[in-house]
C-alpha cells in the first residue's frame, strides 16, 4: 500500500508568456518547472502554494486558480506525489533567484519542454487552453513514463 504526500505547483501565466524556474538543487535539479513543493503540516494546500511561490521566486500572489491534480508514482518509491497545480496571471514583485530556483520568462511558443519533466508536454497544453485536468503518471526513474492517464474535468 502506497502512502501519498501533498505537493503544490504554481504556474505564473501572463498573455504570451509563462514564468518557469530552473531547479538548482534537490529533486528535479536541472529542469525547468513551475514553483512549488511540499505542503507543511497545518497549512492549507493553497497557502502552501503561495508560500512556495514566495520562497522560490520572491513573488506574492493574492489569488490562485486550481487547474490540475496529478498523482505521480515512481517505481521503487513507496510514496505517491499528490500534486495540486495552480495558475495565476497576477503577481506582486519581481521574480528573484533563490537558493533553489532561477526564474525566467518564456514566450508560450518557446516553452523548453526538452528540459522539463517528461509529463509536462502532456498536460501543459491543457493548462494553456485554460482547461482543468486530473491525471496519474507512473515513472521509471525521472525520465521514463511507463503509463499515464489524463482527463479534462469541469471543476474540483
Swiss-Prot record:
Family under the similarity heading: Belongs to the Nudix hydrolase family.
Protein name as annotated: Oxidized purine nucleoside triphosphate hydrolase
One GO CC term, this protein: cytoplasm
Enzymatic reactions: 2-oxo-dATP + H2O = 2-oxo-dAMP + diphosphate + H(+); 2-oxo-ATP + H2O = 2-oxo-AMP + diphosphate + H(+); 8-oxo-dGTP + H2O = 8-oxo-dGMP + diphosphate + H(+); 8-oxo-dATP + H2O = 8-oxo-dAMP + diphosphate + H(+)
Keyword RNA-binding: yes
Alphabetical list of Gene3D superfamilies matching this protein: Nucleoside Triphosphate Pyrophosphohydrolase (3.90.79.10)
Record text on cofactor binding: Binds 2 Mg(2+) ion per subunit.
Subunit structure: Monomer.
Binding-site residues for Mg(2+) 2, renumbered to this chain: 52, 55
Residue ranges annotated for the Nudix hydrolase domain, each copy included: 3-132
Hydrolase listed as a keyword: yes
Subcellular localization, as worded in the UniProt entry: Cytoplasm; Nucleus; Nucleus membrane; Cytoplasmic vesicle, Secretory vesicle, Acrosome
Record keywords, A-Z: Cytoplasm, Cytoplasmic vesicle, Hydrolase, Magnesium, Membrane, Metal-binding, Nucleus, RNA-binding
Motif (Nudix box): 37-58
One Pfam family it belongs to: NUDIX
Amino acid at each position: 500500500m502506497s502512502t501519498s504526500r501533498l505537493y503544490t505547483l504554481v504556474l505564473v501565466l501572463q498573455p504570451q508568456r509563462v514564468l518557469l524556474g530552473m531547479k538548482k538543487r534537490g529533486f528535479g535539479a536541472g529542469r525547468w518547472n513551475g514553483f512549488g513543493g511540499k505542503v507543511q503540516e497545518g497549512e492549507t494546500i493553497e497557502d502552501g502554494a503561495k508560500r512556495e511561490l514566495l520562497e522560490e521566486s520572491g513573488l506574492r500572489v493574492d489569488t490562485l486558480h486550481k487547474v490540475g491534480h496529478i498523482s505521480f508514482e515512481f517505481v521503487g518509491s513507496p510514496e505517491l506525489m499528490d500534486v495540486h497545480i495552480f495558475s495565476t496571471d497576477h503577481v506582486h514583485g519581481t521574480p528573484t533567484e533563490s537558493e533553489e530556483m532561477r526564474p525566467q520568462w518564456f514566450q508560450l511558443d518557446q516553452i523548453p519542454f526538452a528540459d522539463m519533466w517528461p509529463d509536462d508536454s502532456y498536460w501543459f497544453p491543457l493548462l494553456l487552453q485554460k482547461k482543468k485536468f486530473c491525471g496519474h503518471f507512473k515513472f521509471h526513474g525521472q525520465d521514463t513514463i511507463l503509463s499515464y492517464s489524463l482527463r479534462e474535468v469541469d471543476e474540483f
